[in-house]
């Protein structure tokens, strides 16, 4: 069966659902998908089970990897990632967040903000997301007086993490909307959410004119066709026949892109902001991995030692309770990869939670990096600091 061509008729934007485990992120994603399929006959409805589609996830009822769906509103085409809320899987949320232009924060009205609500807000802020919309879910289960308190609490939290004070709140029941797609009263919250997304989220400025770069999120082999690397194009454009380099973790190697697809449709060219699959000539699945980048020839190089400015989270923000010293070895998250690195402090004996400091880091393997790239620092399953590269040393 021939694949259809992706028609670029509306501006494209990447959004995602974030928030605490069990607050209803996947249910909301499914409700949006079902609602859009009713409004737009060409759209395909994805049920909850289709989004949570790995066996382990079905068993535990939690989302582990970020899942992508697509839908259209009157004005835009959205790619939507459903981000995991479960603590062990925050690492996957980081790669999901790295692909988002804006986010929908889910908060259950019957329980209010919880620890992961805060961690996700912090990660969203670190990953450069500028605007969020709050979806106050499970309204049918909550005491109306409690809902008002939760609203105030959530807006305070949103402001605390640097998001605008006029962040909109949409209230409803994602489960109600998913279960009763033909009831206008039940789906009113989804309609309102989509309208708010169209009006409130600014279309991102895409770096189309810069040299091509995509951070690999996943690698598949397709029998008879070769190896496909998927991820979001961070900058530039990519066309079939273009020569590229695979950089980081291993030796840099050249290859040619023989196909570009998005949501199983063929693209004439992939542009900054698109979530694409690239078919690569002569590359074996075992030769490339998540965390490498595919880039225009000679535009990015792998490094392992750099100077960075970091902010250490306080205990209240979910960070460390104690200071750290030179020789500290946490995980550094860049784009879609995490690498262990050793911290050296210059002219400072220790770093306390809440400090802003400059450090030197030496990673155990080289990864593709540029000046000004942001990263998260994690240890023992939690984010302890966030930072930005000031200078590449070697």
UniProtKB/Swiss-Prot annotation:
UniProt keywords, alphabetically: Cytoplasm, Elongation factor, GTP-binding, Hydrolase, Magnesium, Metal-binding, Nucleotide-binding, Protein biosynthesis
Enzyme class: hydrolase
GO cellular-component term (any): cytoplasm
Name assigned to this protein: Elongation factor Tu
GO molecular function, one term: GTPase activity
Chain spans, region G5: 173-175
Compartments, record wording: Cytoplasm
Reactions performed catalytically: GTP + H2O = GDP + phosphate + H(+)
Residues that, per the record, bind Mg(2+): 26
EC identifiers of the protein: 3.6.5.3
Function: GTP hydrolase that promotes the GTP-dependent binding of aminoacyl-tRNA to the A-site of ribosomes during protein biosynthesis.
InterPro entries referenced in this protein's UniProt entry, alphabetically: EF-Tu_GTP-bd (IPR041709), EF-Tu_GTPase (IPR050055), EFTu-like_2 (IPR004161), EFTU_2 (IPR033720), G_TR_CS (IPR031157), P-loop_NTPase (IPR027417), Small_GTP-bd (IPR005225), T_Tr_GTP-bd_dom (IPR000795)
Segments of this protein annotated with the region G1: 19-26
Region listing for G3, in residue ranges: 82-85
Annotated GTP binding sites: 19-26, 82-86, 137-140
Oligomer and partners: Monomer.
